[in-house]
UniProtKB/Swiss-Prot annotation:
Family the UniProt entry places it in: Belongs to the arginine N-succinyltransferase family.
Name the record gives this protein: Arginine N-succinyltransferase
Protein source organism: Escherichia coli O127:H6 (strain E2348/69 / EPEC)
Active site positions, chain numbering: 229
NCBIfam families recorded: arg_catab_AOST, arg_catab_AstA, PRK10456.1
Pathway entry: Amino-acid degradation; L-arginine degradation via AST pathway; L-glutamate and succinate from L-arginine: step 1/5
Binding, succinyl-CoA: 125
Keyword check for Acyltransferase: yes
GO molecular function, one term: arginine N-succinyltransferase activity
Keyword Secreted: no
Enzyme Commission number(s) of this protein: 2.3.1.109
Gene3D superfamilies found in the cross-reference section: 2.40.40.20, 3.40.630.30
Domain of life: Bacteria
Gene: astA
Lineage per the UniProt record: Bacteria, Pseudomonadati, Pseudomonadota, Gammaproteobacteria, Enterobacterales
């Protein structure tokens, strides 16, 4: 059975294996053991209540409960940009016009922005390619909404998610090549690694401070503004179906879109509810996949089950109860996995 649980110190080698499969561009999952160990330690201290809000971040893993294999990772940053500035570009417009010459030009322009400072962030979503089946991607991504719904007071009103932009298998980013490299004088992979290992001071020191007309970029770079890596397209679709939208903010490195949503308008958060759980044999039928989570902050768990999402009393097997660390009579959080579909 696939289970979402909080990260543990012993997961570092498994996270290294996952990091080696990302193909680059996933800044928050570098293949660097020391950095990953620090990230795990920060998550543990967050759960223990030892960090200020500006440093808090939760990390979860997707585990096969039978074999102990870690198949994926996802995370939530509680409030971005309160320690180090959180940069992106806002894609706006500057108008240059002359009535005398009968000239009017509305030019797409990139403005450096810190507009999302203080927002909660969905980040570090990666599922091992071998496990991209049977709803695992949905479980991994949407499990975070169950945690946010259960512990709403720990998060801010706006949630953002940076989507990986267009990068090829060799680490080539058209957006970086045309813009970032001119100011940072390094390859995308180097900048990505420095950022992922916490060495972010160079961003504020070197990045352009003035608006940039996109027409000055290569056509290839212009074409990828706000576009996602092909492997990231499913993750974008998942978030958009939950209510997230692209509001013309992009990543400063690869030009990928930043999606955002008010936390209380996220479908899975808004529609999740608490039901009593009982042990037994679940009813057979053509039921949709649903997310089920316990309400245990320190031992949080999420699994997928097929059940009636409108039920008031959820019947689970002994194995499912054990995976959720629940007992008969406990209350669990339930929501349909996909509002638009009967099956995952």
């Amino acid at each position: 059975m696939m289970v979402i649980r909080p990260v543990e110190r012993s997961d570092v080698s498994a996270l290294m294996q996952l990091a080696s499969k990302t193909g680059g561009g996933l800044t928050s999952l570098p293949a660097n053991e020391a950095t990953l160990s620090v990230r795990i330690e920060r998550a543990i201290k967050t759960w223990q209540g030892e960090l200020p809000k500006s440093e808090q971040g939760y990390v979860f893993v997707l585990e096969d409960s039978e074999t102990g294999t870690v198949a994926g990772i996802c995370a939530i940053e509680v409030a971005v940009g309160l320690n180090d500035p959180w940069y992106n570009y806002r894609v706006g417009t500057l108008v240059h016009a002359s009535k005398e010459l009968n000239v009017y030009n509305a030019l797409p322009t990139l403005f450096l922005s810190n507009d999302h400072t203080g927002s909660s962030e969905l980040c570090t979503l990666f599922l091992d390619p071998e496990w991209r089946k049977e709803g695992n991607g949905y479980l991994l991504s949407k499990s975070r909404f169950m945690f946010m719904a259960a512990f709403r007071d720990k998060f801010n009103d706006k949630v953002v998610a940076e989507m990986r932009g267009v990068i090829d298998e060799h680490g080539y980013s058209p957006f970086w090549q045309s813009l970032g490299k001119r100011f940072f004088s390094m390859d995308f992979s180097r900048a990505d690694f420095l950022c992922g290992t916490g060495q972010k001071a160079f961003i504020a020191e070197l990045m352009p401070k003035h608006p940039i007309y996109t027409h000055f970029l290569s056509q290839e770079a212009q074409d990828v503004i706000g576009q996602v890596h092909p492997q990231t397209a499913p993750a974008r679709a998942v978030l958009e179906k939950e209510g997230f939208r692209y509001r013309n903010y992009i990543d400063i490195f690869d030009g990928g879109p930043t999606l955002e949503c008010d936390i209380d308008r996220v479908r899975a958060i808004r529609k999740s509810r608490l039901v009593e759980v009982a042990e037994g044999q679940p009813a057979q039928g053509d039921f949709p996949a649903c997310l089920v989570a316990n309400e245990n902050y320190h031992h949080f768990r999420v699994v997928l089950v097929r059940t009636d999402p409108a039920t008031e009393r959820l019947i689970l097997t002994a194995a499912q109860l054990d995976a959720l660390k629940c007992h008969a009579g406990d209350r669990v959080r339930l929501v349909r996995l996909c509002a638009e579909e009967k099956t995952a």
